[in-house]
Amino acid sequence: MTTKKLLNDITATSPAIATLVLIVIAVVAAAGVGVIVMNIQTQTEGQAGAKDLSVSGEIDMQGSTTVLPFALEAAKDFMEDHPSVDILVSGGGSTHGINMAIENKIDIGMASKQADVEDILQQGYAGAVLYETELGKRLVAVIMNDGASSQSWNVTANTTSLANGQISIADIKTVYEAADGVDTVENKTVKAFQRADSSGTEECFAAWLNLKDSEKQLDSGAQGEVGNAGVWNAVTATPATDTIHIGFVDLGFVEDSKYAADMNGEEATAANYDDYETASDDVGSSKLTSKLYFYTYGVPSGAVDAFIQFCLSDATGEGQDILEEVGLIAL
């Protein structure tokens, strides 16, 4: 298994405001799991504007790669207003984040799935140690493109009629199972795209197709693209004659709804979240949606609680706004 490495050092300096140093390091993983670490350290040289010095300390967050982009942005914004707080944000996956929180080795475990109910304090089980905070929601959209100026797609449980904009999940799975992610459906060439990087979005899609692989997330030879944006750009690029592109992205990255496939007739929209969730579960092996969570060992307090409250805030420019900016769905 190839471990991806990313190193980025960005320094911004001002005599009047806090200096933010962001260091991104990809760490060789244990047990085949890649962990991306971002250390966001704030060093104050002076104060400008309304800075909150009432909370201080260090926060170590690890877990879901779906929540990771939000956590990085939220941490950066929070520290700009709270210069006495340093935040370390890591990936590693939901299971990793939950387990580390259970063992009290981190301050916040990030997850795009719920922990076992017997481990959650609010469920009332003896011996439970995790305090659960529901952060937001995620919806994964199947996207398709045949190059036509007007398109309408619908994923069904067992019927394929490409001429009518329909494709069955069985045919989608067949394409993703092909050695190169390309197969023929009703005399059309269907080319699949997936994520080249580790992604909770891909993990969700892989489970829905029942093509999940312990190392690669999605057990497919489909062409890999970097990030939601990379998959979106690849699928929406003009396809060759008699070719259809197919892929998947988080809802927030759908820039034109004509490419987003319905699920058994249910639209992939934030307003239609519940019905889309039910339909995707009926069509596939699991849902193409999930809630997003923060887990702490016991009830959060101090800087950890202040940061969580910032993430839950629907004030302009705060947590729930940031959540939508990175392609997720607010509470």
Regions of interest found by a model, annotated:
Residues T13-D107, A111-L121, A126-L331:
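Exported/periplasmic ABC-transporter solute-binding proteins
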Residues M1-T11:
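N-terminal leader/signal peptides at the extreme start of proteins
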